Amino acid sequence: LQISLENTPFLENTDIENAHKMAELYLIIFCFENSARHFILKIFSSNFGEDWWNIIKNTDFKKKVEERMSREQKLKWICQRGTSPLFYLDWSDLLKIIRKYENLFTPFIADLKFIELRFEELERVRNIIAHNGIIPDKNDINRLILYFQDWCKQLKELSI
């Protein structure tokens, strides 16, 4: 994508520099979050088959997914966020699902605290990135990188 950002009204050069830094972090959180969603989807598909959503959904999840899908149906000029209901749930909802079905996930991640710690700590950072904020704290940046690397190492060679 080639576009000149230097002439963006009301933004200083430091704002543009921050945007470039945040774009790099977005790549990491995008890969982390989508990897997590696909991992959960694989676990449920392999254990419950095609009907997995009807088995795992609760009233809150069902309502949230239906509202978000309905909104997308009305705004046809905007693409869908995903083909699976998991892509319509919040980051924190993913952790709730994993906790509820812990027995399905522990064969792949021996200690659920591995996921809990990373998901809980990264939720704030993820929200800043997702809402076009700036993360100036190098520790938060390093934590995101480290947690993503941990996630990849833990799940890299799994076959589900």
What are these regions (language model features)?
Residues 1-160:
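Amphipathic alpha-helical interface elements
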